[in-house]
Design a protein with these regions (language model features):
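P-loop NTP-binding core
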Residues: 1-335
């Protein structure tokens, strides 16, 4: 069974995407699921959280160049530029580059409670003109670079090694994140209940919905080549609130947000009747927003990143319930 691929994203920054990626990954790893987390943010926040917990290196800046996602992207970008063409991509006649990265870029968090189940691919911001945003800009010069992420995952044998692959996406859309959009099976949107999010989240969903068509209509790609490397477009699992503050206007914002998503004619997995008990479902009802939320506690973020200092990647109890519900949805949908 292939690993399920899920990305966490939102156009708005500061809503807890990275914290949520790590926390949900950690809770699932605690339950015995094999998790791979991939850091796509140029700020490398997820990598900083994880970096001190693998042994051998004291901080992210000490990781060698060929132990990062940056190196893998650079490697495949140069391969596509100099050796691969659309014919080889279509037929699958791709050289095995896994030998250059397989033993180098996947790290396991050594915290004993995870029993080797919590893993990550770090990104780094120390390389001049080779941070992830720099690489994404260079990738955009050749549309075939959109196939880099599925190639990396395939040659790392990720489908055989992991149950779930989590992508921590930055608040932007470029060829790198679009590659992740298309390679993913599902996505989750952490957000806060405010006026900006009421329209920002639906805009983000609209962008994701349009990406597949964008590349299918490109004359150098087309639907057949896309289908050879990507499956169907990803499904929205649902939206959940982070940094929740209890006030009278909060439900108003959430109600409008849920209604705006409804108008997109996008059916989230959460909107299925069998998950009605996971949603707001009393006097106030939602279809796409979980009723469980992460309370506004700065300690959640600090305890997640506390690993930078204490060599201890911590789970926070506030994420236990939402993690269990997401896992139940994923397991139910793949039966």
């Amino acid at each position: 069974v292939a690993a399920l691929k899920i990305f966490f994203g939102n156009y708005k920054g500061g809503v807890g995407k990275t914290t949520s990626t790590f926390q949900i990954g950690a809770w699932l790893a605690k339950k015995g699921k094999k998790i791979l987390m991939i850091d796509l943010d140029p700020q490398s926040s997820l990598s900083h959280i994880c970096a001190n917990n693998v042994g051998g290196y004291q901080k992210l800046g000490e990781y060698p160049y060929n132990a990062t996602l940056n190196y893998a992207l650079e490697l495949y970008m140069r391969y596509i530029k100099n050796k691969a063409n659309d014919y080889q991509l279509l037929t699958g006649e791709i050289d095995d580059l896994g030998q250059y990265i397989e033993d180098n870029i996947i790290f396991s968090i050594k915290e004993s409670e995870y029993q080797g189940n919590l893993n990550f691919i770090p990104s780094s911001m120390v390389f001049k003109n080779a941070r992830l945003n720099d690489l994404a800009q260079r990738m955009s010069q050749n549309v075939l670079n959109v196939f880099i992420m599925p190639l990396i995952l395939k040659q790392l044998n990720c489908d055989e090694k992991f149950d779930y692959i989590f992508f921590d996406c930055p608040p932007t859309s470029n060829i790198l994140t679009q590659s992740v959009f298309m390679v993913s099976d599902y996505y989750i949107i952490p957000t806060i209940g405010d006026e900006v999010s009421m329209q920002g989240v639906p805009d983000y969903i609209s962008e994701i919905e349009s990406v597949y068509v964008k590349y299918a209509m490109h004359d150098d790609i087309g639907g057949i080549l896309l289908n050879a490397h990507f499956g169907d477009k990803p499904s929205l699992i649902g939206v959940f609130e982070t940094i929740y503050k209890s006030n009278a206007s909060n439900l108003d914002f959430i109600g409008v947000l849920d209604s705006n998503i409804d108008q997109l004619s996008v059916d989230s997995v959460l909107s299925k009747e069998k998950y009605s008990h996971f949603r707001y479902n009393n006097d106030f009802k939602t279809r796409h927003v979980f009723r469980d939320f992460i309370p506004h506690r700065s300690g959640i973020v600090s305890e997640t990143s506390m690993s930078l200092h204490l060599q201890n990647a911590k789970r926070h109890e506030a994420y236990k319930v939402i993690s269990n519900k997401i896992l139940e949805i994923l397991e139910t949908e793949t039966v």
